[in-house]
């Protein structure tokens, strides 16, 4: 099955080189010089979220009444009227085309462990053989991709092809690679969830309702909503692309299947929080920039325990937004690594004998008044609230 370069004679050397490749092929030209770094630091607020249809953009692009109606839908889940959807669609299209987008896609998360997207252009033919750029509220709110080729978890027969994508207005649209990405849920004609986001959104709604009722019972009447929050810490390995190509198991499986261990592993634990190698630092710098453009709050970066292992940790966010951000993060990590002559491995256990890659979620609940319900308080009343919710979580888990 494997070719000669993946023979038993080659394996020990290849595994050693792959794991210990963090110091090879240093490309100093990828590291921004002092002047460029200073400029970047001064302009991060301007850069951050520059490719996101966020609240700032909505406020500037939408009429005041339409903006208020959309915010009401986002915050309270009220029905979105067609005239509001049309107004939002026009504003989205104008903003997207101003930023170079020519297409839009309903971006969803089927039960395949990867995201899915179908790109449609904004063009609409006119009677004189020309085209105009058009985008309607109906196209924004609902799509109809062929669902027959996506797994359904046994919910329905394979010939039942109809599936719908429904806009999730609580997760901001964004631009990537010249396309306007619209986060959506994916469900069947009769409402069965065909993705991983629909159950998440439904669980968030249920928890919001029940947690708010519980807070009212124990005397906290000011709370109107309870959101769940997540801050997924993404661990990963970086290996040299040329060494990666020598290992067919890495290429096909994303992990090693056979081979000898590296001569040095994590015994001394000197890699954890160690100084970043120039090539890795350059990669992390470019990754931060790409993530910040998409409004992903990448906060912390450091070496992990295993050789060639690293971690990126964002600031926590509302759960469905954080999940969307994590899907984007994993995709962008691989793309940026390729530009640096590296390969980013996201498998949970790519190498035997050293640490695998976990993803701490840092799940919690917070009220619309800014209180973390899993944060112990300083008074008996606050501690009572904390203990009630802590016990409820332990009971549920």
Locations of regions flagged by a protein language model:
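Acidic, Ala/Val/Gly-enriched low-complexity intrinsically disordered segments
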Residues: 3-5, 14-18, 29-32
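Basic polycationic patches enriched in arginine
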Residues: 9-10, 34
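Short, Lys/Arg-enriched N-terminal segments with co-localized hydrophobic residues
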Residues: 20-39
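Short, intrinsically disordered, charge-balanced linker/junction segments flanking boundaries
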Residues: 35, 155-158, 396-397
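N-terminal-biased segments
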Residues: 37-55, 81, 277-297
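N-terminal flexible segment immediately upstream of the FAD-binding catalytic core
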Residues: 37-65, 179-180, 303-312
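Active-site core of metal-dependent hydrolases
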Residues: 45-160
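Glycine-rich, acidic/polar active-site loops that bind/position phosphate-bearing ligands
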Residues: 161-346, 354-397
């Amino acid at each position: 099955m494997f070719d000669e370069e993946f023979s038993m004679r080659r394996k020990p050397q290849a595994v050693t080189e792959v794991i210990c490749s963090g110091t090879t092929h240093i490309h100093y030209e990828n590291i921004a010089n002092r002047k460029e770094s200073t400029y970047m630091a001064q302009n991060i607020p301007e850069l951050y979220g520059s490719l996101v249809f966020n609240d700032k953009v909505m406020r500037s692009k939408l009429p005041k009444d339409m903006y208020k109606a959309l915010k009401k839908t986002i915050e309270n889940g009220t029905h979105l009227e067609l005239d509001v959807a049309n107004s939002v669609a026009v504003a989205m299209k104008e903003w997207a085309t101003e930023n170079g987008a020519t297409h839009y896609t309903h971006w969803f998360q089927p039960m395949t462990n990867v995201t899915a997207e179908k790109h449609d252009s904004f063009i609409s033919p006119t009677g004189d053989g020309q085209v105009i750029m058009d985008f309607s509220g109906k196209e924004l709110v609902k799509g109809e991709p062929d669902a027959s080729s996506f797994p359904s978890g046994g919910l329905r027969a394979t010939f039942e092809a109809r599936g719908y994508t429904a806009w999730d207005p609580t997760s901001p649209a964004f631009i990537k690679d010249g396309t306007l990405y619209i986060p959506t849920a994916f469900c069947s004609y009769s409402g069965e969830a065909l993705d991983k986001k629909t159950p998440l959104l439904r669980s968030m709604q249920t928890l919001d309702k029940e947690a708010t009722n519980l807070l009212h019972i124990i005397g906290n009447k000011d709370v109107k909503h309870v959101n769940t929050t997540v801050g997924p810490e993404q661990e990963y390995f970086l290996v040299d692309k040329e060494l990666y190509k020598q290992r067919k198991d890495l290429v096909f499986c994303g992990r090693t299947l056979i081979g000898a261990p590296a001569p040095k592993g994590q015994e001394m634990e000197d890699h954890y929080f160690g100084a970043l190698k120039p090539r890795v630092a350059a990669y992390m710098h470019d990754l931060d920039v790409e993530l910040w453009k998409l409004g992903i709050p990448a906060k912390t970066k450091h070496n992990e325990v295993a050789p060639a292992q690293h971690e990126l940790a964002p600031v926590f966010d509302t759960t469905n937004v954080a999940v969307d951000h994590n899907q984007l993060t994993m995709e962008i990590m691989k793309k940026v690594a390729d530009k640096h002559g590296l390969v980013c491995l996201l498998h949970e256990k790519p190498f035997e004998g050293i640490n695998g890659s976990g993803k701490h979620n840092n799940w919690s609940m917070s009220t619309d008044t800014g209180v973390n319900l899993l944060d112990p308080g300083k008074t008996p009343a606050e501690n009572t609230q904390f203990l009630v919710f802590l016990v409820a979580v332990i009971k549920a888990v």
